[in-house]
């Protein structure tokens, strides 16, 4: 369980950081908040 949780967190953190860094999040399904404009 511990390993699975860590693996999921490690995989999710970089993805969120990448999407947050990108200014364009309109057509990006990986983006939590779709920002258009």
Swiss-Prot record:
Coarse class of the primary localization is secreted
Q: Where is the composition biased (Basic and acidic residues)?
A: 1-15
Cystines in this chain: 25-31, 26-36
Ranges annotated as spanning the membrane: none
Q: From which domain of life does this come?
A: Eukaryota
What does the UniProt keyword field contain? Acetylcholine receptor inhibiting toxin, Amidation, Disulfide bond, G-protein coupled receptor impairing toxin, Ion channel impairing toxin, Neurotoxin, Postsynaptic neurotoxin, Secreted, Toxin
Propeptide-annotated positions?
1-22
Q: For the region Disordered, what residue ranges are annotated?
A: 1-23
Where does the record place it?
Secreted
On whether Secreted is a keyword of this UniProt record, the answer is yes
Q: A Gene Ontology MF term for this entry?
A: acetylcholine receptor inhibitor activity
* Expressed in which tissues: Expressed by the venom duct.
Cysteine amide: modified positions:
36
Cellular component GO terms held in the UniProt record: extracellular region; host cell postsynaptic membrane
Q: What does this protein do?
A: Alpha-conotoxins act on postsynaptic membranes, they bind to the nicotinic acetylcholine receptors (nAChR) and thus inhibit them. This toxin inhibits high voltage-activated (HVA) calcium channel currents in rat DRG neurons (13% inhibition at 1 uM toxin) probably by activating GABA(B) receptors (GABBR1 and/or GABBR2).
Q: Which family does it belong to?
A: Belongs to the conotoxin A superfamily.
Q: What is known of its domains?
A: The cysteine framework is I (CC-C-C). Alpha4/4 pattern.
What name has this protein been given in UniProt?
Alpha-conotoxin-like Kn1.2
The organism is: Conus kinoshitai (Kinoshita's cone)
């Amino acid at each position: 369980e511990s390993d699975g949780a860590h693996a999921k967190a490690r995989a999710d953190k970089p993805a969120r950081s990448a999407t947050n860094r990108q200014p364009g999040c309109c057509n990006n399904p990986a983006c939590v908040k779709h920002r258009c404009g």
